[in-house]
């Protein structure tokens, strides 16, 4: 085989795999948790159609939080009981200090049967994006 044929064949394979890996850009219709950028999270908060949950400790929540947010402490002994009481059909937005606890909380919420959880990450990023903080 010629070197040119091999080069073209490799190029064609790379192109096929690259096209196959492309995302359509459409939101997934699968229920569950997904990460949103701070700006998108602020837009969701401003729309007022999501229940906003702060999964930090009560002490952290008392220092500053998003206006109207519920405080359900991820590390609290009753976290699982509190999320079990949430309406699984409601859309939720969760956040914490840095994004680590919100990711864990979002997965636990999915496990509890909640279908729509936007993980907004950390409060500092949300504040910089214009979230209403009190």
Give the positions of each predicted feature.
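Structural scaffold elements adjacent to functional motifs in cytosolic proteins
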Residues: 52-54
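Rhodanese-like catalytic fold shared by cysteine-dependent sulfurtransferases
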Residues: 2-50, 62-91, 100-134
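Short, surface-exposed ligand- or partner-binding patches at beta-edge/loop junctions that are enriched
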Residues: 95
């Amino acid at each position: 085989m010629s070197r040119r044929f091999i080069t073209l064949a490799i190029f064609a394979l790379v192109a096929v795999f690259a096209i196959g890996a492309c995302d359509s850009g459409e939101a997934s219709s699968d229920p569950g948790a997904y990460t949103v950028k701070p700006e998108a999270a602020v837009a969701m908060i401003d729309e007022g159609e999501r229940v906003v949950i702060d999964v930090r400790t009560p002490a952290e929540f008392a220092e500053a939080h998003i206006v109207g947010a519920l405080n359900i402490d991820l590390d609290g002994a009753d976290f699982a009981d509190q999320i079990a009481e949430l309406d699984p059909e409601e859309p939720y937005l969760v956040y914490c200090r840095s994004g680590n606890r919100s990711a864990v909380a979002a997965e636990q919420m999915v496990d509890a049967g909640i279908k729509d959880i936007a993980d907004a990450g950390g409060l500092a990023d949300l504040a910089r994006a214009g979230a209403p903080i009190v």
